[in-house]
């Protein structure tokens, strides 16, 4: 009985945490010229494009979640990157979450992906295209060792490194988030061509995918860009700090109440949802 109660409590907590946000009630892009508004973790988008789910160069995972919307620049980036990967014989690029039709906050799994400028891409490059069943329930390939200190050699490949490098060399890309162990391996393998490593940033989790972020489009006047990453390849003390044990007394940060929406995003919600 006690176990059942605990299980039910866990289910209720999980269900509450995954309660739908107002943004999920918007099922189609908001008409208008493409405008990314606000910050990556507190914003929205007008005039989002839909990434075509049929392509010779990429495949879209979990299409039932309808998270394949983004700024036209993001759609073009995905098409550009996957074409380059195909030309180099790397394999099929697997596209994960982009954003919802009007952007905005997800009910779980992402703090960002709100302005149509973020995309998750699996760090797998299958030579044979995945079936629809595989795409709907994708199996992530964990590239990082259990202790988090290095990649698993049998799962790492130069093709994966090439895909990340291709993305980082794209002029529209400002950041790529990967696990610290993946960044470390890229640093070891890079050789003398290292400028692109500046954009590759170590971050929690991200053991099986990279999270690519584009710069704010020049004509999205209400879009808030992040500062550029620090100069250098990011392979020194900053990276090594990720592998050090937590300092005594360190606790996980408490979840914060979401900040107020940018006025244009609130107006969008008021018109289309509330």
Swiss-Prot record:
Positions of the UniProt region annotated as Disordered: 225-274
Cofactor(s) the protein needs: Zn(2+)
Keywords: Disulfide bond, Hydrolase, Metal-binding, Metalloprotease, Periplasm, Protease, Signal, Zinc
GO BP terms in the entry: peptidoglycan metabolic process; proteolysis
SS bond list: 44-265, 187-235, 216-223
Superkingdom as given in the UniProt entry: Bacteria
Cleavable signal peptide: 1-19
Compartments (UniProt record): Periplasm
Binding site for Zn(2+) 2: 147, 150
Major location (coarse): periplasm
Cofactor binding: number and manner: Binds 2 Zn(2+) ions per subunit. Zn(2+) ion 1 is bound in the active site. Zn(2+) ion 2 is bound at the dimer interface by residues from both subunits.
HAMAP family: MepA
Main function: Murein endopeptidase that cleaves the D-alanyl-meso-2,6-diamino-pimelyl amide bond that connects peptidoglycan strands. Likely plays a role in the removal of murein from the sacculus.
Known partners and oligomeric status: Dimer.
Protein name per the record: Penicillin-insensitive murein endopeptidase
Species classification: Bacteria, Pseudomonadati, Pseudomonadota, Gammaproteobacteria, Enterobacterales
